[in-house]
A protein has these predicted regions:
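Conserved functional hotspots at enzyme active or ligand-binding sites that engage polyanionic ligands
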Residues: 1-105
Length: 105
């Protein structure tokens, strides 16, 4: 079962333009009540950017990265390779608050 806050390795290619590419960790933000659907909303993680108001920093394993909610996308389960962990409760709370703030502006 795929749950909100899970971190999955997701195959994002093919992409267009400035969309984040490659296979990379992504945090699931779809509510658990929608886990039966064949698509999930995910937020990619990256190590190649600077922290900003809308890109919260997270520690995942032994690495520090950034959540990139402005690159949130819907992906089919077929792109989701395997679960590699989960965000801490505080990180998920920050991510969801960031998304709310982005959409309120």
């Amino acid at each position: 079962m795929i749950k909100q806050g899970d971190v999955w390795l997701v195959r994002l290619d093919p992409t267009v333009g400035s969309e984040l590419r490659k296979t990379r960790p992504c945090a699931v933000v779809s509510p658990d009540g929608l886990s039966h659907l064949p698509v999930h909303l995910v937020v990619p993680l990256t190590g190649g950017s600077l922290p900003s108001r809308f890109r919260p920093e997270v520690r995942f394993g032994d690495r520090i990265g950034l959540l990139v909610p402005d690159q949130m996308r819907s992906v089919d389960r077929g792109r989701m390779i395997r679960k590699i962990g989960a965000l801490k409760t505080s990180e998920l709370t920050t991510l969801l608050a960031t998304l709310r703030e982005m959409f309120e502006d």
